[in-house]
Amino acid sequence: MRHASNKISVKKQAAAIGVCVAALLLGASGPYTTRLSPLDTRAIKTVAVISALGNTFLFERVPDKVFAWLGPPDSHFLEISDWKIDPSIEKTVSAALARRFAVKPIVFRPADFSTWDYSGLKRASLDLNGDPAIDAYVLILRDWRPDEIGYSVHELGGLGLYRKDRPGGHAKLGVFASYRIVVVDALTGDTIASRAALLPENKLPWLPEDPALWPKTPNDMTEAQRAALSAAETKLIDATLLPTLAAMRLAR
């Protein structure tokens, strides 16, 4: 009886392992994977590119206070559509994708994709009413990442300039680009793949900056400051955009 019981137990364990393996295989091609499966790349023929990253710029300051982590940082936004970051991203991504897919234009409102979660992204994607021939949307969106500049408990999202004050009036500054690329099924609105755009070793894209770059207020920025920040963001995006597309099997 004990031998029979052991056989049943082994069979149950084998069945459980089989279920787990099947679930893993199914999950590997489902939502929230970090790259397209071979089946996805064969099924997707036509895409549209949506970049909703470069309309606003965040100024985030963490003061030199003992309990600064208890409350939100001092944050201000600046409208930067005149920097033309999104059109540049869309042009670069479209050119890279055109080697593998047909790329079609799409009309969208950036505000619909500025603050998002996956359920909201599904609704916004289904509301696009794009060309029925489009199989998937490739979206470049603001992401929220842990603070790897000043190591506070706050998160950094989108494009911005971060400042953490230190004792003695010193400050640590960094320009960051926190974003991700998401592929959405145009018919169902479901997420096919999603991947954060990171530097090697999964690091937040950021560059150290001189404290003199911090303006009194966002609206007081000089042309030199605007040019420096725009150039820094372009450098970060150039370093991460195409490698992320390649890692997702969107581009060769």
Residue ranges and their predicted role:
Residues H3-G18:
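Bacterial N-terminal signal peptides that target proteins for export
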Residues M1, N55, P146-D147, V153-H154:
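Short regulatory "switch" loops immediately downstream of catalytic or recognition motifs
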Residues Y32-T34, F77-E79, Y118-L126, G157-G168:
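N-terminal post-signal-peptidase region of extra-cytosolic proteins
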Residues L58-G150, F176-L198:
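N-terminal segment of the mature soluble domain
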Residues S29-F57, P167-R252:
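C-terminal/domain-edge helix-coil "capping" segments
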Residues S152-E155, P208:
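Outer-membrane beta-barrel translocator domains and adjoining extracellular loop/strand segments
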Residues A16-G27:
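Bacterial N-terminal signal peptides
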Residues R61-S81, G158-P167, D210-E223:
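A solvent-exposed, charged loop/short amphipathic helix patch at secondary-structure junctions
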